[in-house]
């Protein structure tokens, strides 16, 4: 039986209250040297839900674990059916004002880098460069046998051919690209193997129960060491993969600033948490800095 990932903290318990004052965020960016750490909350305005915010998908959806995926063919079939259907929507998501604001900060030399916990590629689509995808990307798939990486669009084409007419109506989409389907809707969905060696294909993302590659973690730690401050955008910081960088920055005496509507696990380490929607908040900050944030058509 799969276990639902659980919270190891109580949101809002004896934590500093959020504010609506964006001045500290604007001041940090004006000073430069800011490292951005983004989470699922920055993509909700693009139609991709988060895990733990209001109405988050963990309330109705148990994400696939690495252990289940690698051990059980039926779990892989269920995953790929849901992911294939979800990709039709997920793959069409477009950057929102939050992503475009981050790209504008980067273009004007205010950032030292962007680390994202998201797997949607929307920072890059908005124009951000050198983005570190902490948890990988749904744009790629990897063979667990031969290690070959291939484009997700090619797998999508092969799955379409193997499952002609597969078009159940999903109840929703999740941050990991899964569509909400029942076992009956999954039916006899056919999974395709690696085109090179016939091995098992997996999205090039870090599943629950899987570790972020050590080299990637160290690269992120280097980015924290080189930054003047850390700006967290849309992350509850519930999992250690992101929280560790907040702790590192705070221990080094670097200001940590958070923009997230709900309480986060890192609030005690931050100089401020702005409790505002990300798109409008970051657009306001950009305006204060005299920066132009491109519209959706030009992002």
Curated annotation (Swiss-Prot):
- Database matches in Gene3D superfamilies: SIR2/SIRT2 'Small Domain, TPP-binding domain
Q: What broad class of enzyme is this?
A: transferase
Listed A to Z, the keywords are:
Cytoplasm, Metal-binding, NAD, Transferase, Zinc
Q: What does the UniProt record say this protein does? A: NAD-dependent protein deacetylase which modulates the activities of several enzymes which are inactive in their acetylated form.
Reactions catalysed according to its record: N(6)-acetyl-L-lysyl-[protein] + NAD(+) + H2O = 2''-O-acetyl-ADP-D-ribose + nicotinamide + L-lysyl-[protein]
- Binding annotation for NAD(+): 39-59, 117-120, 234-236, 278
Q: Name one GO molecular function term.
A: NAD+ binding
Q: What is its main location?
A: cytoplasm
Q: What is its EC number?
A: 2.3.1.286
Q: Does the keyword Zinc apply?
A: yes
Kindly list the GO CC terms recorded for this protein: cytoplasm
Organism from which the protein derives: Streptomyces coelicolor (strain ATCC BAA-471 / A3(2) / M145)
Task: Tell me the superkingdom of the source.
Answer: Bacteria
Q: Spell out the disulfide connections.
A: none
Q: Which residues bind Zn(2+)?
A: 143, 146, 194, 197
Q: Where in the cell is it found?
A: Cytoplasm
Q: Which family does it belong to?
A: Belongs to the sirtuin family. Class II subfamily.
* Cofactor: binding comment: Binds 1 zinc ion per subunit.
Protein name, UniProt field: NAD-dependent protein deacetylase 1
HAMAP family in UniProt: Sirtuin_ClassII
The positions flagged as active site in the entry are 135
